[in-house]
């Protein structure tokens, strides 16, 4: 049975980890694309492909002039340098795989950011994603299953992927600096509703406890400026 990841954002793969105080960060990689020829991936490995369905619930989006996680060292998100551009307290849910290349009318409160130069866009979302899809390699089509693996027969089934840890056996609540070539890096943090990261010892059965959000944040190679003429 094959295992492969469906992500629109770069796939995040963990190796070693490093720590600041009581919080732990994994080491990010952008992953390897699934191959349409044999082998699709290395033995016992994983690969990334674009899904047919990728449902995400978004609570907030914004832009910051300074890193709100201070180089992955902050326990809580510091939004003092940030401008919020979208908010929905109950969350806006959408299938973003189906929306590729189209405009999405998001339900919530939209705001113009304050004038300034921004390097750190962020998104606060639910740490639960609904995905399905298929991928054909060397003449065999693999379909997603409800358990998160893949099968070579049947039809693609939905899988609810809940991110509860970026490593283990302790709680790894940070996933820093996956590279997006020509754009910058992307990091992710598992947080509670107050945007506080789980401590390394906040873990049960291999999962970080008290988590119900994920913050995705980019560090842009080229910051952008909002002015009165924008």
Regions found by a protein language model. Give the residues of each.
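Initiator methionine at the very start of the polypeptide chain
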Residues: 1-2, 21
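N-terminal signal peptide c-region/cleavage motif recognized by signal peptidases
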Residues: 14-16
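A short, solvent-exposed, low-complexity linear motif enriched for acidic/polar residues
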Residues: 20-230
